[in-house]
Design a protein with these regions (language model features):
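Bacterial N-terminal signal peptides
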Residues: 21-31
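Non-membrane alpha-helical segments in proteins
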Residues: 45-52, 80-94, 108, 124-135
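N-terminal secretory signal peptides that target proteins for export/translocation
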Residues: 1-16
Length: 454
């Protein structure tokens, strides 16, 4: 045993012992890491799946180790690091670490530009992730800058009028609708119809998202999500160079164009699925594709009925509601439309209370207003009664004013649209009331005052 100790402590063998120990530790580390890391090609799809399944916390440390192995093997600027950087960003985002997620996305973006070029279309997916993260952080200006940059990159790669740009046009239009830029959205959806007109001849159903977007832009113009005096000033801004919004100013208040877009969608669906137009059809006579067509046609017709109701054409809306109710009933348990209770179509956002300077030191408290009401056959709110209010009277007027402007799709039965009582609307909000002093806090405040005076 002594001889063994003497042997190990000799200078010649000390370095060998250290090298041997390092080799054993490295071998054990590779054993702990997934077998996929030890292979030349690393499959990261499993990590992507686990992140989608909300299992990011269980795999993020392992993913960091995988990143380190790839970086050691391939170098700090290897394109092999792009995907793990994206996955690390996705994982951190799932865990709510949005700033850290952006750092990973920034690195992935830098690696993509370094390896594939400054304006490479491969970077668009990363930029979209950055935009979505900024939206979660409620940084709307930064999110818009990212969305518009991704659009410009793809437009440069494919051509501004290429049908390959249609997915980017659709996404940009959806973003503008989310951020209340109805003119920008309208211009993009029209551009999409022009760019895809050749492709839409063979598959007109592919034009439906753009037609629906045009209708939604008019609906958003007429029914803004909040009370504003001149909302057109907020709706005509875009950083996209080839998007001219000047001509769209002439489309303001041209609401029949939105109705025509919805009517065109119905015509496309009827042409696509002629079997569902037959008044004698039943669910049993339709195959899976035709059944899906019937559901989509019903939804398109319902969108037009809701449009009529929103724009005050109640008689037209009721006629269509009765027709859709009958068509949906033909599908029996396969019908996907529920008319058993009113559905909210529009309600303005209730303005929150302002935290003024004198309230700056107060902690927010939870308030609530609860109102019961009736929805009549025209979709309007009647007979409101406040059943709960705390603090009493603080937000009652704002809530009731909002409900007076609300529009519901009424309950529909065999006889058509009907009145519905017993509906409830509940609004919770933050307010800043004075905090009641406890004896302990009062005593502490007195001590602080004495120390200051001394």
């Amino acid at each position: 045993m002594a001889g063994f100790s003497t042997f190990c402590s000799s200078p010649e063998q000390s370095g060998l012992k250290t090298l041997l120990t390092s080799f054993i530790v490295f071998t054990l580390a590779l054993t702990v890491l997934p077998s996929v890391v030890r292979s030349q090609t690393i499959d990261l799809s499993e990590y992507s799946t686990q992140i989608r399944l909300n299992e990011a916390e269980s795999i993020i440390d392992e993913l960091r180790e995988v990143f380190g192995v790839i970086e050691t093997r391939s170098g700090a600027y290897s394109p092999d690091l792009i995907e793990p950087s994206i996955l690390l960003g996705d994982a951190e985002r799932k865990l709510g670490e949005l700033t850290t997620a952006l750092e990973h996305y920034d690195r992935a973006l830098h690696l993509t530009r370094t390896n594939f070029g400054l304006f490479s279309p491969e970077q668009a997916d990363i930029v979209y992730r950055q935009s979505s993260t900024y939206l979660e952080m409620r940084s709307f200006i930064l999110a818009q800058e990212k969305e518009e940059y991704a659009y410009e990159v793809l437009s440069r790669a494919y051509g501004s009028n290429s049908p390959d740009l249609l997915p980017a046009i659709q996404r940009m239009g959806e973003f503008y609708l989310k951020t209340f830029n109805f003119l920008g959205a309208r211009a993009l959806y029209k551009k999409g119809l022009r760019s895809g007109q050749d492709a839409f001849r063979d598959k007109p159903q592919n034009s439906i998202p753009f037609l629906k977007g045009i209708a939604d832009s008019y609906k958003l113009e007429r029914f803004p999500p909040y009370y504003v005096e001149d909302y057109s000033q907020n709706a005509g801004q875009s950083g996209i160079r080839d998007l001219d919004l000047t001509s769209e100013l002439y489309t303001i208040n041209n609401f029949p164009a939105g109705e025509r877009a919805l009517q065109e969608i119905i015509a496309i669906r009827r042409q696509q699925f002629p079997q569902t137009v037959d008044p004698e059809f039943t669910a049993e006579t339709l195959d899976a594709t035709e059944l899906q067509g019937a559901l989509e046609l019903n939804q398109a017709t319902l969108d037009l009925a809701d449009w009529h109701l929103l724009f005050g054409r109640v008689r037209d809306a009721r006629t269509l509601y009765a027709y859709i109710f009958e068509q949906n009933a033909k599908l029996a348990d396969k019908g996907n439309l529920d008319f058993s209770s009113p559905s909210l179509l529009y309600v303005p956002t209730i303005k929150p209370l302002i935290k003024t300077r004198e309230k700056a030191g107060r902690e927010p408290s939870q308030g609530i207003v609860k109102v019961t009401f009736e929805v009549n056959a025209n979709g309007r709110v009647r007979n409101m009664e406040t059943v709960e209010s705390y603090p009493k009277g603080l937000m009652d007027f704002r809530v009731r004013r909002t409900l007076r402007d609300a529009i519901y799709r009424p309950k529909i039965d065999d006889s058509g649209a009907v009145n519905t009582t017993g509906q409830t609307f509940e609004h919770k909000f933050e307010h800043y009331e004075l905090v009641t002093k406890t004896p302990e806090s009062a005593e502490k405040e007195g001590q602080n005052s004495n120390e200051t005076a001394g």
